[in-house]
Structure formats: structure tokens, C-alpha cells
Amino acid sequence: MKVLISLSSFGAAETARHGQLWCTELGRQAGADGVEVRGELLRDAAAELPAMAGLAAVYSSPEGLWTHDGHLDEAALARGLHAAAVLQAPRLKMAIGGFGDQSHASLVRLKALLEGAPQVRLVIENDQTATAGTLPALQAFFAAQAQAGMGLGMTFDMGNWHWQGECPLQAAEALAPYVCYVHCKGVQRLPGKWVAVPLAESVAPWRAVLRALPASVPHAIEYPLVGDDLVAVTRDQVAFIRAAREAA
């Protein structure tokens, strides 16, 4: 199993100060097997993406695949595929956005567009929104894409379900056949909101969730990595994820 680091884990301020290339090197020093580059944290994509070519396992697009009214956003997909290609990242991660019943017909077009970019595999993540972060929404999407003969995989974010009041264990049991990538994210409840925390500090049943998910797929840290010695902090968390997965 490979352990990756989603570079958002270092925080917007840290990545803005140093850049994602610096964070990528930090992750390498800490023993991570790769990183997920975050589109929303790029300061100068035209310069940063080529500089990280060959160093990223995943490119994460902040854009949804479908607009709020259910139309396939071909421009957003094209931007994501281009960024992943420049990075030489084998995976592009996106959420489904406003996918609904009216969107099913556009899966044929999506399939054709993806066949035109065979070097990049699209994976779908559950985000924190009502349209793209609930179990019914994701079940409906994966059933529809399977019927369309697409075979898309899922990025299962362990923590995001809580933002929509969903049970992560129920989601893991239902969606495990599609999961090809796991975002490890613990959660705690603060007044009026959920926040991401390391798995060891989580109030969620993360061990049971891990047991329900495929063990061999890449697992990424996506919770705050902070401390005076970021390499040491990150190294400890990489080791924690490896041990937690083995124990599950």
C-alpha cells in the first residue's frame, strides 16, 4: 500500500509561503510514496505544474464535473486533464458537482472525452456538498456510470461524509467495490461545524471504516500537519497510516 500526502494537509498559509514543490520535497523526506497536488492552492499554475512534473500521483481539481443545473462542464474537465497531463500525474480527482437524473445522457460524452486522454484516470471523490457528498448521490452516480460502461473509480474521503450528516461506515460498506483511493481524515465537532483532525484524534469509527475499504489501494493523509519540525511530524503520520492500515 502506498501512503500519499494531500498537500492541503500543510495548510493554505504554508503552501502559499513555500509552494507545493517545496511541500512535495518535504513529503519525500518524510517517507511518503507520493503527493496529491491541489489545484486550489496553486499560485502560478503555468510555472508550478511543469516544475512538479513526474512528482505527483494525483492532481486534485477544485471544480465539479457537472454544473449546478446538471450540465457536464467540459471546460472544467479539460482544465483538470490538462493539469494532470502537465504534472504527468496518472490520476485526476474531481467531484460530481450537480450531477442528477438529467445528467445521465452526458455520460456518453464524458466517456468519449476520457477515451481521448487515456494517460489520465479520472477518480470521483465524495466532497462536503449536498449534491456530491451524500451516499444516495454517490450511489446514483456510480450506478449510472456503470450502466454507461465507464468503470470509474472512487476516492473515498473518510471524513467528508460528516459535513452532510452521513455515516462513513455505511458509505464504506456500500461503495467499497468502487474505491481505488482513500483519503484518511479524522473529524471532531466544534460549535456549529466539523473540523479535520488526525485519525488518532477522530470521534468517528475510523478503524471500522478502514476495515470496510480495500487495503491495497493508495491511502492519503488529508488532515492538518503542523509543528516546528514538519518533516518529523509528517514522518510520524505516514508511519501511523501504514500501521493503522496493517492493523485494520
Put a short name on every predicted segment.
Residues 1-31, 78, 82-88, 109, ...:
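Histidine-acidic metal/acid-base catalytic patches
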Residues 97-142:
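Hydrophobic, well-structured mid-protein blocks that either form specific transmembrane helices
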Residues 13-15, 68-72, 131-133:
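Conserved glycine-rich "GG(E/T)P / GGGxP" loop and the immediately following alpha-helix
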Residues 43, 98, 126, 188-190, ...:
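Intrinsically disordered, low-complexity segments enriched in polar/charged small residues
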Residues 47-52, 113, 236-240:
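Short, aromatic/basic amphipathic alpha-helical patches
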Residues 3, 29-108, 121, 160, ...:
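Structural motif corresponding to the early beta-alpha repeats
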